[in-house]
Amino acid sequence: MQSEFIHLRTQSSYSFLESALTIEKVVELALLHKMPALCLSDRGNLFGSLEFALYAVKKKLQPIHGVILNIQYDINVFAQILLIAKDETGYKNLLKLSSLTFTKNDRKICDHINFEDLIKYQEGLIALCCYTDGIVGKCLLARKQEHAIMFARRLQAILGDRFYFEIMRHDLPEEQFIENSYIQIASELSIPIVATNKVLFSEKSMHYAHDVLLCISEGVTKEYPDRKTVSENCYFKSPAEMKKLFSDLPNAIQNTVNLRERCYFAAHPNPPMLPNFSTQDISETYLIRKYAKEGLLARLVTKFKAENISREHQEKLKTEYFTRLNYELDIICNMNFAGYFLIVSDFIKWSKKHGILVGPGRGSGAGSVVAWSLLITDLDPIKFGLLFERFLNPERISMPDFDIDFCQERREEVINYVCSKYGNNRVGQIITFGKMQAKAVIKDVARVLSLPYKCADYLTELVPFSAVNPVSLEQAIREVPELANAAKGKGLYNLEGDAELIKLVLDTSLILEGLHRHSSTHAAGIVIAGTDLVDIVPVYKDANSDMLIVGYSMKYSEIAGLIKFDFLGLQTLTVITNCKKLLKEQGIEIDFDDMTFDDNKTYQMLCKGKGVGVFQFESIGMKDALRRLKPDSIHDLIALGALYRPGPMENIPTYIACKHKLQQPDYLHKLLKPILEETYGVVIYQEQVQRIAQVLAGYTLGAADLLRRAMGKKIKKEMEEQEEIFVKGAIANNISQSQAKSIFATVAKFAGYGFNKAHAAAYGVISYQTAYLKANYPAEFLVACLNLELNNHDKINLFLQEAKDNGIKIIAPNINISEGYFSVKSSDTVITHNTKPLIPRLNNEIDIKDTAVKSLYYKDESTIIFALGAIKGVTPNFGKLVTDERKARGAFKSITDFIERLPPKSINSKLLENLIKAGCFDELHDNRLQLFLSVPKLIAYSTSYHQEQESNQFSLIKVSSLSPTILVSSNYADKNTLAFYEFESMGLFISNHPLTEYQEIFSRLNILNTRDLYNKLPNGTNQVTLAGVIQKKDSRMSARGRFVTLVLSDPENIFELTIFSEEVLKDYVHLLDVKSLVVVNCDIVKDEGGIKLTAKSFLSIEDAINNRQFELQLYPQNYAELEQIITLLVSRTGHGYQSNAKATIYLQSKDVKHFVAKITLSETFFLQVQDFEILSQYIR
């Protein structure tokens, strides 16, 4: 392909928020204009270089690698330079120079290289002195021609004939101002000129959208006066346009072609590159065989002891295990993967040695006996029937991939160890790129174009949300009618707004969608290289870390030859670690290494569906499945973990029925019974598919893995080929063709969603471990769970409810008991706290003298003490500060004592308000409302007190002689106010739920609580009436339209319901505020997937009660109390209430000490919320 011009100044969206072009688009544009080559020259980085090279080569376009860098020529003298790789040496130097801009210590000035860096790494590079942004252009703009010539000579001296002057014509004044002088200097110094054009968007019509992109970059609106702009000419000009533009400088056009001919390197894939594990003259093959055999012997000694295996059987097992070990080792060594296994084994052994909990396995790697022997996994693959070929297939060579779960809190320690062992320059994290996806791009563009927030928010809500497959804006406009109308300029149905502006927002968003917006770091991926990373890939450093980060995404890092290791932080392992620590403090040691999975208490708990906090078994549907399954072995837990997914879930009833002998298993063929017996005839695992192919059709396990993959992908051609092989092999095994075809079809159906048994088994073990801890040590386990969820108040509520269900006492937040984190106190633990109110009601002056401290002993029960760090606005560090002060100087005696003893900087109004609302000072002062209203004065007192202490002016004066801190006068808050104080400060109701008072009434009105909902209601579709306090409201969109989810609570639990009907939303909008008390009539669907509630109508609590006739049985203790009841009821018959309202009272006992008042209220009788609080004191 011949061309008369090559673009050298093309930027992609890897120049974040500067270019509106993707890699694919720039290549397509070059091909469209019949260019044989294209230079990608992003600003400051080579993040897209390998992606660009591979895509360009695929499309038969020559890729040229360039980068625009800032270079420091002198103190405070910075300018841009475009560097282009001529050959492989040049590309490697380009990697080093671009990486230096991120890794230099003086990045605070700007991302740049020094002139000395260019001298050091100039080999193989072509340099273009950027036009107005380059050093020569900047000097000319400053009217310093002598300086311009000086810097040009310096660059020419270093680069020789590899140094060019760039010239641009975007019709900008600054370009025209320097052009003549610029060309003159080039001529005098014999420096060739190349014509370039900034390529930031595809065509001139995209200038508007690109301008919006620049505004997004700067965080300003389009009306902002002093913002960055670029010429409308920064588009992908054709060769003809460029020739015409530079018709007076034909050599500048020709030089782009000449320069292209000097470049002959393209970034390419590399084979995997690992560091040498051993620094001595010992082969990795020798080491892995040695360590694996030693490790297997140690594993078997533990196994034989734990399982009490006879000596005779031990020898037989040794032969079986070592045969499998040697088979795996031969494959691993032949594939040259010994080093990989040794590296993984080394950092896992280090972790375990240093007390860092590592998961038993994850993914197919748990199927390897070598991995088990090297302590990479803790799962016996032969015992659990796991296959090595599922992990490493000798018939399909690919890199092994161990994903390792670590205790989340100590994962960084393992990474630091790897860095120290292999070198900081050879270990790195992996970059990820955030893109402008549909919802985000609408928000960005709407902000720039000043679309009202309400309209912008509504627009984004119209885009359906999918975490797995994000919906594009184009797709959303096709599928959501209201969006489609808005895109046509018809505005929004439910909102007033400028229809044309809304259309412009959508049009612009469609253009910018998919562009890179920013970079971040992969959550788990770590690469370890055999050489410095910068020799292979671009690297950079995040501002928050000193660790190198590979500048290619995960996909392109692996293509470049880097080996990825996933260091995953699993929160459950942190729960286990912290629970074991709590137990160790009590002298209880837990060792899971030789666990036999036969604890009856554990299975009894699971059979009751008590899955809260148990790994994998926390969902409502899972808990229901546990109750029906009644698991009694680890194999049941593994199977349920694999089955509980869309697709396989439909086989749960079959598995349960066969387990409980209510149905006969179908093994498909007698030869398959040994394979399917464990799962009652249900094909659950991918390994079962492999074994079926091996036993029935003569496949090798490697070939069977290829069959499994084909079945999973459902590619028709592959399936037809595999079916032919399967049937042919089965016929050779004396199975009829029709039966073979039938079995193939059945297995293929299961294989489509079959689960990796190695992964299921490893995670089943973690499930068992958490269940064991919960069943045997519930308080310690739940405290460990709580302390990882300090900011998740829904989870805290869930765990505390579970604690109550287990008979564990909960101590509300208390400034003299609580710590930064949740804590557990066992029986006979002494808890010291104040018991006497320190301040009389409505007293305006704090009295710190009248204090009584008492010790409480909680016998024969565990107690969980609420964490200060779980209160909103309060951190665990503040909790530690409080705890340390208590340990040093004793319990706080009053709120002034508290304020005086803590540094004033540690206490602010919001923190103090929330501590008060949460009830932390209830035992120091019995009027929470009074303290809350006095916060400003308390904060003022804190400031003045500490100022006086610092000045030492009052060092000899007693505190009581200072000006008194005045509390405002206040009555006591009612129970509901206090309950909502707690909700506002902790996100939950801890001492009293607003609906507690109504439970007796609700039971008479057939209003269910959530305990009944989950435990008594049969499966199927029903209608129920529930009552709850709205705790959270969230509006969402689906393809069918808007819907709202509500999170509510009652005294028993938290539940979620959905409102799909716009009519329901409209009719009851006045009742749907957070903190509203409502009764809801809803449809309920209860099945294996859990419980789904759909709201049909709402009532306020008052209306719900007063619209029904019901009966109350009250127990006044005397005539005075009876008179109070009658007075209350009489008061509700007047004042606008219906005159025919009736309340009938029956005295069932004449004994004055044992009144029983039976009250029947008519449908028209009206009671208020506060009435039930009064009446409830007489309900037994």
Curated annotation (Swiss-Prot):
E.C. numbers: 2.7.7.7
Q: Where in the cell is it found?
A: Cytoplasm
User: Which GO molecular function entries does the Swiss-Prot or TrEMBL record give?
Assistant: 3'-5' exonuclease activity; DNA-directed DNA polymerase activity; nucleic acid binding
UniProt keyword Nucleotidyltransferase, yes or no:
yes
- Functional summary from the UniProt entry: DNA polymerase III is a complex, multichain enzyme responsible for most of the replicative synthesis in bacteria. This DNA polymerase also exhibits 3' to 5' exonuclease activity. The alpha chain is the DNA polymerase.
**What subunit structure does UniProt give?**
DNA polymerase III contains a core (composed of alpha, epsilon and theta chains) that associates with a tau subunit. This core dimerizes to form the PolIII' complex. PolIII' associates with the gamma complex (composed of gamma, delta, delta', psi and chi chains) and with the beta chain to form the complete DNA polymerase III complex.
Q: What is this protein called?
A: DNA polymerase III subunit alpha
